[in-house]
Amino acid sequence: MSGTFRFPALRLAPALLVVALALVAACTAPNAIVPKTGGNVGDQAPEFQGIANWINSERLTMEELRGKVVLIDFWTYTCVNCIRTMPYLKRWHDLYADKGLVIVGVHSPEFEFEKLTPNVVDSAKTFGLAYPIAQDNDFATWKAYSNRAWPAKYLVDKDGVVRYKHFGEGSYRETENKIWELLIAAGADVRDILVSTVPDPKFLPEARSRDRALRLTRELYGGYERNNTRSGLYIAHGDYYAGAERVLEYTDPGDHQNHSLYLQGNWFNGYEELRHARKTESFEDYIALRFSATSVNAVVNPGEGQPFEVQVTIDGRPLRPDEAGPDISFEQGRSVFKVDEGRMYEVVALPAYGSHELRLSSNSDDFALFAFTFGAYEEGP
C-alpha cells in the first residue's frame, strides 16, 4: 500500500482494562474444561501442521509459544487484500513483540509459483516482514483451523486458546484492542502503549453501486480451473471452455462489459494461468477489459523465461503519470511494466473512481496472467 501511514492514538479506555483483568481471572480458574482443537473462538489452537519451511525464525510450535499471545495470519503474497493489511501487522509487531506478542504469518499459496521458498523470502523482504513466516504449501495448517479466506487472523491467548478471529481486511482497531487485552491477561504491562484510533481505510461508496456496470469489478482469473465454475466464467469467449490446456486464436468482439476478460490473438488456457501462445512484434495480441475501480493490479509470472515488458493502455491511450500504478514506467511515449518475477504488479492508480477500458499486451510468449484485482480506496492497491 502506497503512502505514509500515521497513527493518531490515545490510551485504551479504562473499561477495556477492566475486561482484560477479568479475563486474567477467567484464564486462571481451577478445574477448567479443556476445549476441543480447532479454529473457532474458544477452541484450543491447532498445532502448526505440514509446514514446508520456516522464514525469519527457527521452527515454532504452539506448545512452545504457551505464555505468549499469538496472532496467526493466513496470507499469500500475491493477494491484494493481504498486502493491504501488512502496515497494521508490521506496526503490531514493532509495538508488541517485546511485550509477548508473536505474529506468525502462515503462507498458504493461491498459485503454484507461490510455493517456492525463494519467492516467499523475496516477498517478505520486499514488504518488510520481520516476524516468523511458515510455508503451509499443502494447506495442512489452513485445514486444521478450518480457514476459508485470505487474509484471516486468529488471536490465541497465553493458554493456547483461540480468543478472536477475523476474515478479510478491516477491523484493525478492534483487533489491536484484543491484542492489548490478551497481553494484559498474560501479565504484560502495555498500559504505556498508545492504541491506534485511526478508522479503517474508506471504501468508496460508488463501488457498491446497484448498477452492475458501475459496481467495483470482481476479481478476474485467467486460469481454466477458476473459470470453469458457477462463480467463474471470467473469460467472455465460449471456445475457452471447451477444455483446458489448449491454444486457441481469439477475436475480440469489441463490446466489453464490466466483470469479464476479452482476448485477441493466440492464448493458452492453463489450469492456473492464461498464457500468450506466440511471439509477436507489435503488441497485436492482448487481454482487454472494462473495469470500474480506482486501482487495478495484475498477478503475472514469467515462469522460467526471460524478463519482458507488458504494454498498458487505458481508454485507447497510454496511462498518464497521475493514473499509473507504482510498477508502471514510461518509455518512448508508452506506459509499460517490466515482469521479472511472479508477483502482483500495481498497474493503475486513478485519482478518482470511474469506469474505463484497459488493455494489456506483450510480445513475449512467457506472458502469463493469473488474476486481476481491483481497489476502491482513496489510496493504495
Which residues are covered by each model-predicted region?
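Bacterial N-terminal signal peptides that target proteins for export
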Residues: 2-16
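Non-globular targeting/processing and membrane-anchoring segments
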Residues: 17-53, 176-381
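A short beta-strand-turn-helix
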Residues: 47-70, 93-96
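Sec-exported extracytoplasmic/periplasmic mature domains
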Residues: 50-53, 80, 84, 94-98, ...
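Short active-site neighborhood of thiol/selenol oxidoreductases, capturing the structured segment around
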Residues: 60-83, 89, 102-104
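Structural microenvironment flanking redox-active thiols in thiol-disulfide oxidoreductases
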Residues: 83-126, 135-141, 310, 377
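Thiol/disulfide oxidoreductase modules built on the thioredoxin-like
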Residues: 125-130, 135-178, 347-352
